[in-house]
Design a protein with these regions (language model features):
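Conserved segment of the helicase C-terminal RecA-like domain
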Residues: 168, 195-237
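A short beta-strand element within the Helicase C-terminal
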Residues: 168, 177-192, 214-218
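Post-DEXD/H (motif II) to motif III coupling segment of the RecA-like Helicase ATP-binding lobe
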Residues: 9-10, 15-84, 223, 228-231
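Conserved helicase ATPase core of P-loop NTP-dependent helicases/translocases
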Residues: 128-134, 140-172
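Conserved two-lobed SF2 helicase motor
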Residues: 1-11, 158-177
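Conserved interdomain hinge at the start of the Helicase C-terminal
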Residues: 88-136
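Walker B catalytic acidic pair
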Residues: 4, 20, 27-29, 183, ...
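Non-catalytic terminal extensions of ATP-dependent helicases
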Residues: 238-325
């Protein structure tokens, strides 16, 4: 399992032999093409001369298979179910903005949703950055996610949202597919989806595994609900009396050591309880990578943890411990 670039790097270094690799599965193949990964996929396929089968998994139907895949006879298997566009357990709303710039209306909508988890979808990277900065300036706990970020920045953003340190995820359509984040309450279309497939993938982030969810179209003065939306759309009235932005219960810290430094989840819990003086109930999700780790801790104890662990070693190793903002 790995990205095309990472797998090619392993092959170049001789970490495993291509001789015995008979099958290649590329997940989200259409999305890889859309994001410009043709060169990486082409190099990987060229590095695997003994392939007998290529499996290209896609949520959309390809007009043609790119030549670099070197496919022979192509057989298409369609597993899509003939079912309704959006499950009935998702309620669809429209919210009218009096201005073309909808940021103020977005802020009011998010205030009305309280501490519920929401993904705000936009169509452009710079729009994600602008919207995220605006919401943060208003006191919201957000994560920004798009393809222009470095890998570690995307990991930071995704981890904060998945562990509850940020309850608002501001993203391009990159966040509409391939992210395994359960229990998302709301989908907000700040920008209208560019096509029906985009709409379906966005809305599919909520109401998973029989849960319920809500999706909101944020409409400017000249915008209307797209014609491909076949569900009933209700008007959503934002209350006049709104609370302050909800602060998530957890915050995320970064620890600059990981698996290859012989650091385990148990080591981290012990360290934070002993040195950081936390109770185990004040520690949330822990994700240990090769060279670093993310940990969710109670937001009310964040300053305490950072102060008490400053300059302290974990398992006799010096490290950096800081908040992921």
């Amino acid at each position: 399992f790995g990205t095309p670039g990472r797998l090619t790097d392993h092959l170049d270094k001789g970490n495993f032999s291509a001789e015995h690799v008979k099958y290649l599965v590329i997940d989200e193949f259409d999305k890889c093409l859309e994001m410009g990964f043709q060169d990486e996929m082409g190099r990987l396929i060229a590095s695997l001369p003994y392939l007998e089968r290529h499996f290209l998994l896609s949520a959309t139907e390809a007009e043609e298979i790119p030549r670099f895949v070197h496919m022979g006879r192509v057989e298409t298997i369609d597993y899509r179910m003939d079912e309704e566009q959006v499950p009935e357990r998702i309620r669809i709303y429209q919210v009218k903005s009096p201005q073309k710039d909808k940021l103020e209306t977005l802020a009011q909508l998010l205030l009305s949703l309280g501490d519920e988890s929401s993904i705000v979808f936009l169509n452009y990277r710079d729009s994600v950055e602008r919207t995220n900065e605006f919401l943060r300036s208003r006191g919201f706990a957000t994560s920004a996610f798009h393809g222009g970020l470095e890998q570690h920045e995307r990991e930071d953003a995704l981890y904060k949202f998945s562990n509850g340190s940020a309850n608002i995820f501001v993203s391009t359509d990159l966040g509409a597919r391939g992210l395994d984040i359960p229990d998302i309450d709301n989908i907000i279309h700040y920008h209208l989806p560019e096509c029906e497939d985009s709409y379906i993938h966005r809305v599919g982030r909520t109401a998973r595994w029989e849960a319920t969810g809500k999706a909101f179209f944020l409409l400017g003065p000249s915008e209307d609900i797209p014609s491909y939306v076949d569900a009933e759309v209700e008007d959503y009235e934002i209350p006049s009396d709104l609370p302050a932005p909800a602060k998530p219960r957890m915050a995320t810290i970064y620890i600059g050591k990981g698996k290859k430094d012989k650091i385990s989840k148990g080591d981290i819990v012990g360290y934070l309880c002993k040195i950081g003086q936390l109770q185990s109930s004040e520690i949330g999700k822990i994700d240990v990578k090769d060279r670093y780790a993310y940990v969710a801790v109670s937001r009310t104890k964040l300053k305490q943890v950072l102060k008490l662990t400053a300059g302290q070693k974990i398992k006799g190793i010096k490290t950096v411990i800081e908040e992921v903002r």
